[in-house]
Amino acid sequence: MKKTLAFLLTLTLLMTIMAGCSHQQMPSPADPVTLNIWHVYGSQTISPLNTLIDEFNRSVGREHGITVNVVSVTSSSAIDEALSASANNEPGAEAMPDLFTAYPRVAEIVGKENLLPWDDYFTENELSAFHAEFLTEGYFGDRLLMLPVAKSAEAFFLNQTLFDRFCADTGITSDDLASFEGVFQTARTYYDWSGGQSFIQINDYYHYAYVGMKAHGVELVRGGTLQLDEDAFRSIWTPLAEAAIYGGICLDEGYAAARWKTAEVIANTGSTADVLYQPSEVIYSDNTTEAIKAMAYPYPTFTDGASGVIYRGGGLFAMKSSDERRNQAAVIFAKWLTEEEHNLTFVTNAGYLPVTDNAFDALFSDLNQIEKENYRSVYAAVETMLDSYTFYALPLYDGASETQLDFEANVKAVLKSARNQYVKRIGNGEDPETVMEALIAASLAELISLSGT
């Protein structure tokens, strides 16, 4: 009897201790937690995520004693650099944030062992609510280190107001923008019609090349090496180079949205999230302004039989803490952010796609619920692509980030040089067709040389 009583007393004591520990491991208003976050959503304008974070802090955050503090809103490349500086304790580096949004490549920068495994805190049922492909990207081995919060696809954006004016004079129509062949022909025609203005800016040549090669049944990257000597690459390089050398493609650095504001270009390919930065008017060189209508169209195709597009977007990472309250606070915020209502509010104000199946279905069941016409056109374009396009995630391989950045820089440098030579040689009286043909071939050879393939 005494042994039984002693056992029961010991068991009761252990349960009390465990309950107390469990309570102590959760944030509360009496024992609050502040989490610092770096993110990429809205670095050039009002941030939809900041607005939602404010809502969290006023509601669920207050109930649990959690404050999410936005420290930095910037580009993904800037976050990569800042994380690297913090991880390496470089002089002047910021303290490592508790939460950050980034691409999978950063796991190596901060160390996978230092990241919070979300699968330890989400039940199987909770994880099953996520769109399977989006969730898969976040796994490193068997650990879920990157939680999807928003994804984007690529689309074709158009200043419809100025384009319609151009169409009235030339007979070009929006149907000509369905393929890259048509886009590049339109770019040359626009250059002539406008007196020397570029038509389009391509925000990501690596994506252009990746999807273009896929359309021809060939991989852009094999064994970590670009396959630029393939006939398939030559077939997608030639029309691109011709339009760029002619002057129809803007090759300068910077964002397309900035050039929309001054009508330096009237179109671009880029992330669906570009809609967040599109201006509602243009300012001309004489300081007059004009209201414009911006519209989105599906990503142009390369061949009749193969339509493809990149989907992208990083996810939410959390630094693992020895203070379990901080881990729990990160999880509470992450679960709140990915709930259908909050996730839809966030993504539809930023041009992104929701990350759970239910939210996905709710969005595309009725696009009329989206008030702004330019945003509605983005999701209409995505809906079209969901029906008939293959969606590709970029491959991860050693040096992928550097390869992509180098390719972007090399394409622009090679085409800028060819463009300058074209203007000079034509000005000296050489035959335009002969010069163009030579420069297309020379630019490809130079790109292959620079890429080391």
Predicted regions and their residues:
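Short, polar/charged alpha-helical segment
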Residues: 43-65
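Extracytoplasmic "Venus flytrap"/periplasmic binding protein-like
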Residues: 62-130, 166, 266-267, 285-288
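Hinge/lid segment of periplasmic solute-binding proteins
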Residues: 100-155, 181-184, 289-300
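Short, solvent-exposed loop/beta-turn-alpha elements that line the ligand-binding surface or hinge
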Residues: 119-130, 173-175, 216-236, 242, ...
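Extracytoplasmic/periplasmic solute-binding protein
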Residues: 141-149, 154-156, 181-226, 234, ...
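Glycine-centered hinge/linker elements that transmit conformational signals in sensory
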Residues: 184-188, 222-254, 294-299
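Extracytoplasmic/periplasmic substrate-recognition and gating elements
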Residues: 248, 285-358
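Conserved C-terminal helix/tail region of periplasmic/extracytoplasmic solute-binding proteins
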Residues: 383-453
